[in-house]
UniProtKB/Swiss-Prot annotation:
InterPro entries: IL-1_CS, IL-1_fam, IL-1RA/IL-36, IL1/FGF. The keyword Disulfide bond applies. Residues 1-25 form the signal peptide. Anti-inflammatory antagonist of interleukin-1 family of proinflammatory cytokines such as interleukin-1beta/IL1B and interleukin-1alpha/IL1A. Protects from immune dysregulation and uncontrolled systemic inflammation triggered by IL1 for a range of innate stimulatory agents such as pathogens. This is Interleukin-1 receptor antagonist protein. It comes from Equus caballus (Horse).
Length: 177
């Protein structure tokens, strides 16, 4: 019996040793940060850029392509992820205020978010792939999708009518090299 307990203790010690680096790198249960940067554009070829502290989608001419915002993506579950603006401490969020649901950028470092916190749910989007395109549904407000307007240079927003022709909810992503 004593030998069996020792074996179990040694096995536990070995497992803890083997996974120590994983737990040491991510104390307090924080998830590993596997952040990747992506270029993003809608199916009408509009890219994201900042104008007057607002994220908008439009057609950038070659001389202005450096204004294009790249999106940082941090996966937290197979299809759930956090989205932020690359190189900035701004995250995409879905906020409910009364009966109103709106998109906003919040001054938050994407690597500080934790999937286990209810207050971070507004930053969580569910990715749905359909062939080469991707849609992003809010986890905090199911049925609401990240979208762009058909017209250029309009703010990025959310819609609960993803099939309406006046809103675009399908995006292309390309990993930034």
């Amino acid at each position: 019996m004593e030998i069996r307990r020792r074996s179990v203790r040694h096995l536990i010690s070995l497992l803890l040793f083997l996974f120590y680096s994983e737990t040491a790198c991510h104390p307090l249960g924080k998830r590993p940060c596997k952040m990747q940067a992506f270029r993003i554009w809608d199916v009408n070829q509009k890219t994201f850029y900042m104008r007057n502290n607002q994220l908008v989608a439009g057609y950038l001419q070659e001389s202005n392509t450096k204004l294009q915002e790249k999106i940082d993506v941090v996966p937290i579950e197979p299809d759930a992820l956090f989205l932020g603006l690359h190189g900035r401490k701004l995250c995409l969020a879905c906020v409910k205020s009364g009966d109103e649901i709106r998109f906003q950028l919040e001054a938050v470092n994407i690597t500080d978010l934790s999937k286990n916190k209810e207050e971070n749910k507004r930053f969580t989007f569910i990715r749905s792939n359909s062939g080469p395109t991707t849609s992003f549904e809010s986890a905090a407000c199911p049925g609401w999708f990240l979208c762009t307007a058909q017209e250029a240079d309009r703010p990025v927003s959310l819609t609960n009518k993803p099939k309406e022709s006046f809103m675009v909810t399908k995006f292309y992503l390309q990993e930034d090299q």
